[in-house]
Amino acid sequence: DLDGHDANWNGSLESNELHTNLLEFMADTHPWIADTDGDGMWDGWEYQQGLDPNNPLDTLTDPDGDGLVNRLEYNNSRVGTGYSEVDGIRSTTPLLNDTDGDGLLDGEEIFVYFTDPTWNDTDMDGMPDGWEVQYGFNPRDPADARSDLDNDGHDYDRSQAVEPDEYYTNLQEYLNGTDPTNPDSDNDGIPDGWEVQYGLDPLDPLDAVLDMDGDGWDFNRNGEVAGNETFTSLEEYS
């Protein structure tokens, strides 16, 4: 009855997507009827996803609490909200509330943010949808990856302006684990962008008081540079 499920939505059923006659027997479903309980969800998908292919009532339940009932998990395009579809997969997992693991519930993606619940970076800008939402960005706009929301870039060429190539972009903030709304994530007095540019750790406040390149001076001529003789990273920045 060809009631397997095309899980990758590529238009064909691979061997691991078939709901074989043996599985029909094990699930007590009808081998000649694709949807034994007539609930609009094919037996193979229900069995694969841990639902009951003999219970028509589970079509309107939401076991994972993500805001999508099972019939909408089975085919997201039934929703009709105009959400973005990136990877062509229109089925979410009915027992997992965040199918793509981006930090947003499947229902939130479809009804609130109009993002793709099976692809964790809808605008493909390198920043996951959930992270963008967390910090107030638009998960459907790739341009915000290139901006510098908190202005923690630096005027390296001393032109009196921070040009785009001197930005510490939102994408860099994500990749380095820094806060794109706070120019100094570790509160050490040095902007995140400057720390990353010079190989410091923007999440470690202690590197502000270190003399990374050893360019302090032994003012008291005692054979070592110590204490207030160091030229710290914070002083280098200042």
Question: What is each stretch, according to the model?
Answer:
Residues D1-S238:
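Extracellular calcium-associated, cysteine-rich motifs in secreted modular proteins
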